[in-house]
Amino acid sequence: MRRDVNGVTKSRFEMFSNSDEAVINKKLPKELLLRIFSFLDVVTLCRCAQVSRAWNVLALDGSNWQRIDLFDFQRDIEGRVVENISKRCGGFLRKLSLRGCLGVGDNALRTFAQNCRNIEVLSLNGCTKTTDATCTSLSKFCSKLRHLDLASCTSITNMSLKALSEGCPLLEQLNISWCDQVTKDGIQALVRGCGGLKALFLKGCTQLEDEALKYIGAHCPELVTLNLQTCLQITDEGLITICRGCHKLQSLCASGCSNITDAILNALGQNCPRLRILEVARCSQLTDVGFTTLARNCHELEKMDLEECVQITDSTLIQLSIHCPRLQVLSLSHCELITDDGIRHLGNGACAHDQLEVIELDNCPLITDASLEHLKSCHSLERIELYDCQQITRAGIKRLRTHLPNIKVHAYFAPVTPPPSVGGSRQRFCRCCIIL
């Protein structure tokens, strides 16, 4: 809020007179003021620091800077800013996000590691200047590190994982997605020193083979979350080892791992009863047989991405409707064998009335308005995707909305092709083509 006083615009932090601020400082003890300041975000703290010398000291006290997220300022953050923050915060800092801060490199992060040895959560996602030298610094100075995000730090190699293994034994969550220089040797070194890992994100680590998963399965019994999206060399052999060694697994993403078969679904059903999230988009070898075993054994499933699992039929939906009462999000896009009958079972199933929130049916050519009728009873349904479902009509969507007025329906209806010109010589285009 700003006011105009004698033609001069002032922020609310500049509206205190010296006497006002003096009264506050006199009435409230320093400890209480510090406690109040501890609830303020970075921007507000910086504004408070400009009110007076006393408030400058309070606002910039290291105890107020235990959690810092600089994502909103990513374009402006350079190495010297991180160095200054680390010197001011010191041992108080527990959580820092530098996500997207392209100007931050190894030298600044070495200073940070030296000064902030109690750091527990650090995000360097997208900090592309970061190399193995940073992980060496973290290993040397930050033994309390629990969560580390290095996604898209493409210079990271096996040396980083070896360093983390040696110096960060408390590590529970590591994201090295798109660090495509990492191989099975790096994973082997990591898990031998960080056996308490609970979440491992390996999306786009295209050099990883089954051998890497065998190391994880053998050394990470606490693993809860594993993301292997587009790890194209992974097969049943490696993932079965994960299932047998990581019984606490709750979330698995294997989307794009096109080599896997029903053997994985059987292994999950037999070994991972706590599974809540399964993403297997574009895994075209999976069938109803595997999903039947999965559904009958994993009753806590909440989210399933089955996009382009082209062999599944209504049989899978029948099993999910019977055995998975907690299902909230289901993607069936490009599952072209799904029909209205499968949606009918889902709409009458255990999850329908209170749980199901999102269903995606893009490019399901056999789906008609009858499916929308079956989904009317899903009172928690928030969103439905119907792109390129050519038998769905506007009238069917309108009827669905009368029962579920707050639902978001994403659909597309091709514009009508304009009539030919009188002379008949003009080429006909649909409206989309004309616009383009």
Swiss-Prot record:
Modified residues (Phosphothreonine): 417
Pfam families recorded: F-box-like, LRR_6
Signal peptide location: none
UniProtKB keywords: Cytoplasm, Leucine-rich repeat, Phosphoprotein, Repeat, Ubl conjugation pathway
Record PROSITE patterns: FBOX
Keyword Cytoplasm assigned: yes
Name of the protein in question: F-box/LRR-repeat protein 20
Tissue/organ expression: Highly expressed in brain.
Residue ranges of every copy of the F-box domain listed in the record: 22-68
Positions annotated as LRR repeat: 74-100, 101-126, 127-152, 153-178, 179-204, 205-230, 231-256, 257-282, 283-308, 309-334, 335-363, 364-388, 389-414
Changes seen on gene knockout: Altered electrophysiological synaptic activity, with increased frequency of miniature excitatory postsynaptic currents.
SUPFAM superfamilies, sorted: RNI-like
InterPro entries xrefs: F-box_dom (IPR001810), Leu-rich_rpt (IPR001611), Leu-rich_rpt_Cys-con_subtyp (IPR006553), LRR_dom_sf (IPR032675)
